[in-house]
UniProtKB/Swiss-Prot annotation:
Coiled coil location: 483-524
Disruption phenotype: Failure to develop under standard conditions and failure to induce expression of carA-1 and carA-2 early in development. Failure to sporulate, even under conditions that bypass the dependence on early cAMP signaling pathways. Do not form mature spores and all cells of the mutant spore mass are dark in phase with round or irregular shape. These cells are fragile and easily disrupted under a glass cover slip.
Induction of the gene: Up-regulated by P.aeruginosa, PAO1 strain and PA14 strain infection.
Descriptive protein name: CAR1 transcription factor
Described function: Nuclear transcription factor with zinc-dependent sequence binding specificity. Required for carA-1 and carA-2 expression in early development. Also required throughout later developmental stages - where it has a cell-autonomous role that is distinct from its capacity to control carA-1 and carA-2 expression. Required for terminal spore differentiation but not essential for cell differentiation and cell sorting. May function to help insulate distinct pathways from simultaneous and universal activation by cAMP.
């Protein structure tokens, strides 16, 4: 934050309404507290009661001052105040202007005080300077030379019609000797020395004899020394010949917490044009303008253009009214207190938003700092870089000024107040092209005369022909601004593109992780499945033909665990289209021939969301599986059971207990026994089934002889095979249900998948009709469940022919376990032949099918309810 921003953010200004006496607040950090507003201010009292704390002036003098005091250094009879027009003398000043004493044109021959000689004034000043440490530091020699040049230049301007008491050359040399034997001033001691100058009762004012130069020399007042100006020397008592030299600008005053310092600048109430300028003959070209004096026009917005630079080259400087803010004062000159007007808005980063009427393009906004010109002023002599304190006088005048502000004056006042050597990093927009190569005061104003844009809303054509510094930087600044906008837009576009790329990469990474997780899950349920879709189609087309050797099928199953799943996504899309086409043919032909829709057996029923888009009245069209392959019963093809039944038909065993037998990898689908349940099952009803595991999983069932009468195999051998005392290999293993069969009902929180290295078995299976053709769905049952609004909580269960309850913890205990099965279709819908349920058990640790079982059961459509006794009595 710059100094002006810190000042505006921390300084609170009183809000008043009118002002009798102007205060030209041109310091970088303007902060005035309790300035005395008496009409006739005693200079001695003002300085005595003014103390400096952290470069902030505090005036504690609240007493009335005698209008006709003989001891006043300056006796202002007509509301004349001490015009301290050097706001920069306390912090990084360029023009080392000390206290400026301007004269009132109406004070002609109004002083009755006794006059003292210039020599007495010099003696008093000499004694004060010699008794104080005015200079101190390594840069004192430069400071000495600057002050000497200032004194010489100021004393060369005593051209006021013979009415001024100018110093003689001896007096000049005396002042030079005094200054060369001094050091850099300390403000407390320096001010106290000036205040405590020896005073006699005989000190009197040097009155002029009354001239006719009313306003003629108003533009020629020296900012450094007011030497008998305007024939009205009544205001410059004891200071007409040799005004007090100002402190050098290479002294940097201590900074306060608010980093603000200011010397109040007072104006005469009856003065029309008091715009003084430096008349240093050492300036190459136009000298620095007095940016600290306010003119008080008789009409509003009167631009006082009398601020000409009276040097050797006084060209093209007619509009140098920088910081010469016009203000129409109240007619009451003796009673109203000081008025401060605060700007309506303040933008910390970009400057002050002006609320007053502006000339030019008033709709233009202040540009950001990146678009401001970068003018590094190379200063000659004793200039100090005053970074951050650029808006000293312009904005301070604006803050203490009223309405009707000339925008050209304000915009050109920002950096022309004795801060002309500042290396402005942020606010270098409003410097003049009057690059005054003043080797002594280092006022190199290499700025932009046209404000922010040359020819824009500020048109102040102050060119110095002698210096040839017509730096029309407006177009360059506008080009820099456009370049800044383009860079900003390009950076924003690049950031947006990077964000999009990052989002895309993140989405791809998430998709890959999801696919990997689903792949790991799918591998647990794809044991023994062939991965070649063309092979599935070939076997599906030969459902009713047993021409394909079983050995070939076995080789396909054996090689499955080592196959990769690459390319399945593309093949699955083709297979899904064929399945949809074949499903339409199945609807047209009816349910009589189920072998025509073999490819629909590759539907993936493992995903819980696989049936969300399924319509009961339309064929089942399931979404793609994550692995790109359709699920079928683990370890089997849809035609495996039918082929093996024709080659090696199993032995039918009637029992209420179902035994698992070893899975033959070389002959998938081959069973030694088919377990016929003694009790029928009913559609849409749960029925518990008890399963047994062999004690020796690698040994086939000992079913070789069947009793013709009972139809039961040799029980003795079977009892020996199923020894209850022998511990099963899979004892205490947990049984998980494959998602293609599992149904949880209203239960939502239960474990569906085994953990890593967990001892578990996964149950998978499918339903076949009486001819061992797979059943995919039943149109009649589907429409029935739709009318009953079934599976509203579990839409993924719609269309399934068999459901197994999976929300109950099930483990192998004593060589067996029990599951609850619910058939969703009946035998009457499938040629009135009992249905076949086929199950497999897969070990997730080895990812291999280990056991299998085949069940034959009669499923009835309706279950007759038994009426209770009350109903029977009612019917009777």
């Amino acid at each position: 934050m710059s100094s002006i921003e810190q000042l505006y953010s921390t300084t609170q200004f009183p809000s008043l309404s009118s002002c009798n006496t102007n205060i030209n607040n041109t310091n970088n950090n303007n902060n005035i507290n309790n300035i005395n507003n008496n009409t006739n201010i005693n200079t001695g009292n003002l300085l005595k009661n003014t103390f400096f704390k952290n470069n902030i002036i505090y005036n504690t003098n609240n007493n009335s001052i005698n209008n006709n005091s003989n001891n006043n250094i300056i006796n202002n009879n007509n509301n004349n105040l001490l015009n301290s027009n050097n706001q920069n003398s306390f912090q990084n000043q360029n023009n080392l202007n000390s206290i400026h004493n301007h004269n009132n044109n109406n004070n002609n021959n109004n002083s009755n005080n006794n006059n003292t000689s210039n020599s007495e004034n010099l003696d008093s000043l000499k004694s004060a300077l010699l008794s104080s440490n005015i200079f101190n530091g390594s840069s004192s020699s430069i400071a000495h030379q600057n002050l000497i040049n200032l004194i010489i230049s100021s004393q060369n301007n005593n051209n006021n019609n013979g009415n001024s008491n100018s110093n003689t050359p001896d007096q000049k040399s005396t002042m030079a000797d005094i200054l060369l034997n001094s050091s850099v001033p300390d403000y407390f001691e320096w001010c106290s020395d000036i205040i405590n100058m020896p005073k006699d009762g005989n000190e009197k004012s040097n009155n002029s004899n009354g001239g006719n130069n009313n306003g003629n020399n108003n533009g020629n007042n020296n900012n450094n020394h007011n030497n008998n100006n305007n024939n009205n020397s009544n205001n410059n008592n004891n200071n007409n010949s040799d005004s007090v030299p100002s402190p050098q600008n290479n002294y940097q005053s201590p900074q306060s917490d608010n980093q603000s310092s200011m010397v109040p600048s007072f104006n005469f109430s009856n003065q029309n044009s008091a715009n003084s300028s430096n008349n240093n003959n050492n300036n190459n070209g136009s000298s620095n303008n007095n940016n600290n004096v306010r003119s008080e026009p008789t009409t509003p917005n009167d631009e006082s253009n009398n601020n000409s630079n009276n040097t050797n080259n006084n060209n093209n400087n007619n509009n140098n009214n920088n910081n010469n803010q016009q203000q129409q004062l109240s007619s009451n000159q003796n009673s109203s207190p000081l008025i401060y007007s605060v700007p309506s808005y303040y933008v910390p980063n970009y400057g002050v938003v002006l609320s007053a009427p502006m000339k030019g393009n008033s709709s233009s906004s202040i540009l950001p700092p990146q678009a401001w010109p970068q003018n590094n002023n190379n200063n000659n002599g004793n200039s100090n870089s005053n970074n951050g304190n650029n808006n000293a006088s312009g904005f301070s005048d604006f803050m203490f000024n009223g309405s009707n502000i000339d925008y050209n004056s304000i915009m050109n006042n920002n950096n022309n107040n004795n801060n002309n050597n500042n290396n402005n990093n942020n606010n270098n927009n409003n410097n003049n092209n009057n690059s005054n190569n003043n080797n002594n005061n280092s006022n190199n104003n290499n700025g932009n005369n046209g404000g922010m844009f040359n020819g824009g809303f500020v048109n102040n054509n102050n060119h110095n022909n002698n210096n040839n510094n017509n730096n029309n930087n407006g177009n360059l600044n506008f080009h820099n601004f456009l370049q800044f906008q383009n860079q900003l837009q390009n950076s924003n576009q690049q950031q947006q593109q990077q964000q999009l790329q990052q989002q895309q990469q993140l989405q791809q990474h998430q998709q890959q992780q999801q696919q990997l997780q689903q792949q790991q899950l799918q591998q647990q349920f794809n044991i023994g499945k062939p991965c070649n879709i063309n092979q599935k189609k070939g076997r599906g087309a030969n459902n009713n033909n047993n021409n394909m050797p079983i050995g070939n099928q076995a080789s396909l199953v054996i090689s499955h665990p080592s196959l990769k799943m690459e390319g399945h996504h593309h093949l699955q899309q083709q297979q899904q289209q064929q399945h949809h086409h074949q499903h339409q043919q199945h609807q047209q032909n009816g349910n009589g021939n189920n072998t025509q829709i073999v490819n629909s057996a590759f539907l993936d029923l493992s995903s819980p969301d696989s049936h969300n888009q399924m319509s009961p009245s339309s064929p089942i069209c399931l979404p793609e599986s994550p692995m790109g392959a359709q699920h079928w019963e683990s370890g089997l093809d849809p035609s495996s059971l039918q082929k093996q039944n024709e080659i090696n038909p199993p032995i039918s065993v009637r029992s209420n207990v179902v035994f698992f037998e070893p899975y033959l990898a070389g002959e998938p689908g081959r069973h030694k026994a088919c377990w016929n349940l003694l009790e029928p099952m009913h559609r849409n009803y749960y029925q518990p089934i008890q399963f047994k595991l062999p004690s020796f999983p690698d040994t086939s069932l000992p079913i070789t002889q069947i009793d013709d009468k009972t139809g039961i195999f040799d029980s003795q051998r079977f009892l020996a095979f199923n020894n209850p005392q022998a511990m099963s290999k899979y004892e205490s293993y947990r049984i998980y249900i494959h998602p293609s069969l599992g149904y949880s009902g209203n239960a939502k929180r239960f474990k569906q998948q085994p953990d890593v290295n967990e001892k578990a078995l996964i149950l998978d299976g499918n339903v076949y009709d009486g001819h061992l053709n797979p059943i995919y769905n039943c149109k009649i049952c589907t429409e029935y469940y739709q009318t009953k609004s079934y599976f509203s909580a579990n839409p993924h269960a719609k269309g399934k022919v068999l459901l197994v309850k999976n929300n109950i913890l099930t483990r192998v205990k004593d060589g067996g376990f029990t599951l609850s099965l619910k058939p969703m279709c009946c035998s009457g819908h499938n040629s009135h032949i009992p249905l076949y349920f086929h199950f497999t058990l897969t070990n997730p640790l080895t990812n291999e099918v280990v056991l299998q079982s085949l069940i034959n059961v009669n499923v009835k459509q309706w279950k007759k309810s038994v009426p209770n006794k009350s109903k029977k009595q009612r019917f009777e």
